[in-house]
From Swiss-Prot:
Organism of this sequence: Xenopus laevis (African clawed frog)
Protein name: Tubulin gamma-1 chain
GO molecular function: GTP binding; microtubule nucleator activity; tubulin binding
Gene Ontology terms: biological process: cytoplasmic microtubule organization; meiotic spindle organization; microtubule nucleation; mitotic cell cycle; mitotic sister chromatid segregation; mitotic spindle organization
Disulfide bonds: none
GO cellular component: centrosome; cytoplasm; gamma-tubulin complex; gamma-tubulin ring complex; mitotic spindle microtubule; nucleus; polar microtubule; spindle
Gene: tubg1
Signal peptide positions on this chain: none
Keyword Cytoplasm set for record: yes
Cited InterPro entries: Gamma_tubulin, Tub_FtsZ_C, Tubulin, Tubulin/FtsZ-like_C, Tubulin/FtsZ_2-layer-sand-dom, Tubulin/FtsZ_GTPase_sf, Tubulin_C, Tubulin_CS
Subcellular location: Cytoplasm, Cytoskeleton, Microtubule organizing center, Centrosome; Cytoplasm, Cytoskeleton, Spindle
């Protein structure tokens, strides 16, 4: 019984990481850029139909919806070798093609105008699935389309498909360099409100950390977008391997999410990946064992979220899921878990069990890989709140001076007042407070005292 997943790609960032993701999936399943299964790909052990469906003439088409308010990125996809992979009916470009101008309010209000056309596409995809499990949304939170239209769609998806899961891959802006989007803190904060209230699970892709990993670990001097996006597609494909090469555990999205998210609002996940190498020379001097991979995943330098050091709060893991790919002896897994617990290599919440789960997954038989074992960590860690605190600090600076609010005032949602902004600030603050509360033993009764 396949549990299908529909991917929604929004805006420049969403479509670029989505494009890399589909490239990666095609390579892993032995599907050519035109969607034809390659001659060598005859093993029937993978489940292609979670992410693809078959057209009448046997070729595979991604269950993807490509949305943008300006044509550039989608045109570049349509001029690539993968142009014929997608269903052309699933591509939506807005009529006037002016984009959202990096303005959340513009993306949001354009969403109100065009949502019927978009939901025609989404409903058609949903009707074409046997038992739809949910939606995966790829977007960035700092721009206009991914954040504004993304926020609008998150709200509507909840109304329209209340029982379906919504998972997002949300790209957070790079804090190490100056942004050319001056209203980025506003956009981010408004989107965070929706990610808190309308998504079941948010995988945080932090550009700050991804750039650092590319420079420090992969030794790329000035990483380009496409190199960063390859990192992202590695994470995205690894986090879905258990769905595509099903084992006896974690073979659907809810299984993945349930083990990581014990309380509904704390659903922002960080990821770590190892071994990260682009050159083959390193591969020959390193023996990768399960313990090795699991220990490395706990090292901060492999974690793809750059979190601040907070001396006051004793930050800790709420839950960890390691997806280990490759040749693994299951007894080794048990031993590794024991070692990690005995040596207290990870600091866990005081109010619940130290939950480290391990999902073993096969690797794609069609891709050569330099390493016997590779691993992805998906972790729910309270320190992710430092990202939100950073956004709030930047927002407060701008809001105090009422800087750049003119562009927002043009749209209906902000015509009379900026309540929506202040309300979002409040909700993100509650989220931060709850993450801090989760580091204390009395978290279970948190939120009941003040009612």
């Amino acid at each position: 019984m396949p549990r299908e997943i529909i991917t929604l790609q929004l805006g420049q960032c969403g479509n670029q990481i989505g494009f890399e993701f589909w490239k990666q999936l095609c390579a892993e399943h032995g599907i050519s850029p035109e969607g034809i299964v390659e001659e060598f790909a005859t093993e029937g052990t993978d489940r292609k139909d979670v992410f693809f469906y078959q057209a009448d003439d046997e070729h595979y088409i991604p269950r993807a919806v490509l949305l943008d308010l300006e044509p550039r990125v989608i045109h570049s996809i349509l001029n690539s070798p993968y142009a014929n992979l997608y269903n052309p009916e699933n591509i939506y470009l807005s009529e006037h093609g002016g984009g959202a101008g990096n303005n959340w309010a513009s993306g949001f209000s354009q969403g109100e105008k065009i949502h019927e056309d978009i939901f025609d596409i989404i409903d058609r995809e949903a009707d074409g699935s046997d038992s739809l499990e949910g939606f995966v949304l790829c977007h960035s939170i700092a721009g206009g389309t991914g954040s504004g239209l993304g926020s609008y769609l998150l709200e509507r998806l909840n109304d329209r498909y209340p029982k379906k899961l919504v998972q997002t891959y949300s790209v957070f802006p790079n804090q190490d360099e100056m942004s050319h989007v001056v209203v980025q803190p506003y956009n981010s904060l408004l989107t965070l409100k929706r990610l808190t209230q309308n998504a079941d699970c948010v995988v945080v892709l932090d550009n700050t950390a991804l750039n650092r990993i590319a420079t420090d670990r992969l030794h790329i001097q000035n990483p380009s977008f496409s190199q960063i996006n390859q990192l992202v597609s590695t994470i995205m494909s690894a986090s879905t391997t258990t769905l595509r090469y099903p084992g006896y555990m974690n073979n659907d999205l809810i299984g993945l999410i349930a083990s990581l998210i014990p309380t509904p609002r704390l659903h922002f996940l960080m990821t770590g990946y190892t071994p990260l190498t682009t050159d083959q020379s390193v591969a020959s001097v390193r023996k990768t064992t399960v313990l090795d991979v699991m220990r490395r995943l706990l090292q901060p330098k492999n974690v793809m979220v750059s979190t601040g050091r907070d001396r006051q709060t004793n930050h800790c893991y709420i839950a960890i899921l390691n997806i280990i790919q490759g040749e693994v002896d299951p007894t080794q897994v048990h031993k590794s878990l024991q070692r990690i617990r005995e040596r207290k290599l990870a600091n866990f919440i005081p109010w619940g069990p130290a939950s480290i789960q391990v999902a073993l997954s096969r690797k794609s038989p069609y891709l050569p890989s330099a390493h016997r074992v590779s691993g992805l960590m998906m972790a729910n860690h309270t320190n992710i709140s430092s990202l939100f605190e950073r956004t709030c600090r930047q927002y407060d600076k701008l809001r105090k001076r009422e800087a750049f609010l003119e562009q927002f005032r043009k749209e209906d949602i902000f015509k009379d007042n900026f309540d929506e902004l202040d309300n979002s600030r409040e909700i993100v603050q509650q989220l931060i407070d709850e993450y801090h509360a989760a580091t204390r033993p009395d978290y279970i009764s948190w939120g009941t005292q003040d009612k």
